Every structure is written in structure tokens, then in C-alpha cells.
């Protein structure tokens, strides 16, 4: 009885006469070991990238957008074109909310504090304060450059330090087969 079932099963081709059977290639069926999973395969789209000089390049990207315009790229970046003097680094956030926040609240976080007076006095005081702060900053930079030298780096390599020895070292164990 079983033979007749198997014979009928293997006798049928599974397709109607005249058709060709198409087989798709499959990945080899391997046992996936622990920690050896297959990498994820991501779909990639063809994206037209418009560079800053107007040229268009087609690239493959995972971002599903047809066209992307770049503000700054290798055509107008001073790192890629060191011989061009007309290039300036463009801040992408210059018109953003972070820049507006810095403009509005930068006076709150400044080190120098001034008391509000009449407008003419504040203008004169602010100019004097700016000059004083510039002089102080220059002096601090000079002192900091002179104070820190190669000896400070060598002091980090002091021989009196000892390594802390505690705990057990992990040892590799061979798998028994």
C-alpha cells in the first residue's frame, strides 16, 4: 500500500505538459552556529545626488528618495580642494533653531557680567570691557602655552605606578568533540 502511494507521488511531475519547470537558486542550507548569523540584506534604491556645482550622480542608497541636493560636498569642501582659496566651510545649522538659541541666550552664558546703565554709558563700558577681555584672553593663552611643556607629558610616565592585580584571568577552554 505504501509503495503505491510513493509510486504515485514520485510519478507525477507537478506541472502540465509543455511547461518548463523554473528553479530559483537558494542559499545553501547550513546550520547557523551561535554567534554566526547571516548578515541582514537591505534593499537599496537608485538615488540622483545633485552636487553643489549642479552635476548629477546616481548612487545606491538605503534612503528611499529619488533626488537629494547636497549643500556641501567634495566639490566645495576646503578639505578636498586645498588649493582653492575661495572656499569657506558652510555651517548647515547656521539658520536653524540651535543658532537662533545661541544668538538669543549667548549673553546669559558669558563670563563677564555687566550691570545695566544708560545706553551711552553701556556702549562706552562695553567697548572697554571688550578690550580688557581680549587682553586677558591673550595673556591666558600665552601663560597656558608656556606652562605646559614636554616635561608634563613625561611626568605621566612615572615609574612609581604599580598595576593592580586582582581577580582571575579568563582562560580559553577547548571544545571537547
From Swiss-Prot:
Q: Does the keyword Mitochondrion apply?
A: yes
Q: What is its main location?
A: mitochondrion
**Stretches for region Disordered:** 111-144
Q: Which cell locations does it reside in?
A: Mitochondrion
Q: Which GO terms describe its biological process?
A: mitochondrial translation
MF terms (GO), sorted A to Z? structural constituent of ribosome
Q: Where is the transit peptide?
A: 1-14
* Record's protein name: Large ribosomal subunit protein bL31m
Amino acid at each position: 500500500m505504501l509503495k503505491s502511494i510513493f509510486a504515485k507521488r514520485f510519478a507525477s511531475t507537478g506541472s502540465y505538459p509543455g511547461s518548463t519547470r523554473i528553479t530559483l537558486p537558494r542559499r545553501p542550507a547550513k546550520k547557523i552556529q551561535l554567534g554566526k548569523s547571516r548578515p541582514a540584506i537591505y534593499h537599496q534604491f537608485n538615488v540622483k545626488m545633485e552636487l553643489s556645482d549642479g552635476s548629477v550622480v546616481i548612487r545606491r542608497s538605503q534612503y528611499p528618495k529619488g533626488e537629494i541636493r547636497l549643500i556641501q560636498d567634495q566639490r566645495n569642501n576646503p578639505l578636498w580642494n586645498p588649493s582653492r582659496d575661495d572656499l569657506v566651510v558652510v555651517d548647515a545649522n547656521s539658520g536653524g533653531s540651535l543658532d537662533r538659541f545661541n544668538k538669543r541666550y549667548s549673553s546669559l552664558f558669558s563670563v563677564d557680567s555687566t550691570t545695566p546703565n544708560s545706553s551711552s554709558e553701556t556702549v562706552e563700558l562695553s567697548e572697554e570691557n571688550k578690550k580688557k577681555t581680549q587682553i586677558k584672553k591673550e595673556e591666558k593663552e600665552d601663560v597656558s602655552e608656556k606652562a605646559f611643556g614636554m616635561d608634563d607629558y613625561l611626568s605621566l610616565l612615572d615609574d612609581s605606578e604599580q598595576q593592580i592585580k586582582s581577580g582571575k584571568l579568563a582562560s580559553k577552554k577547548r571544545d571537547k568533540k
